[in-house]
Amino acid sequence: MLWLSGCVSAPQSDALLTHFSQETGANPSVTLAARVHLEQVPFFPQEDFQCGPAALATVLQASKVDILPDALVSQVYVPSRQGSLQVEMLAAARRYGRISQILAPDLEGLLEQVQAGKPVLVMQNLGLSWYPQWHYAVVVGFDLPRGEIVLR
């Protein structure tokens, strides 16, 4: 039997944390707080393969749209893909009067949005580069001294 274990982090995460001073709680070149948590953002547990509707309902409710994940399933979930496509997620948000802003894949920019009180819907690969397992989640906070990002 072969057991493998490992831990990796992205270069942008390492760079941000390297420049962040735990002693002062701030980095002179980055205007990020040490800790932020958007506690008012709702949480919806997901059904199997339903991370898209759950994550989208989370950000829509945070922007004052009264919607539940079940109401979004028919709009964004593609059964043959066992998931939701980005284009469907963007279109559904627009149907509810919300225009999504696509962010560059930059950790600092993402954290700045969260610090500004905006939860960020992210698509993350929970698998491997050669065998991806895509998953939607919502970033609702961070703790830079601990190197943690809070997801719903």
How would you name each of these model-derived features?
Residues 55-60:
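Buried hydrophobic packing segments
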Residues 8-38, 42, 66, 71-152:
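Conserved active-site-adjacent core of cysteine acyl-enzyme catalytic domains
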Residues 63:
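Extracytoplasmic/lumenal acceptor-recognition loop(s) of multi-pass membrane glycoenzymes
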Residues 51:
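Active-site-proximal loop/helix segment associated with metal-binding centers of metalloenzymes
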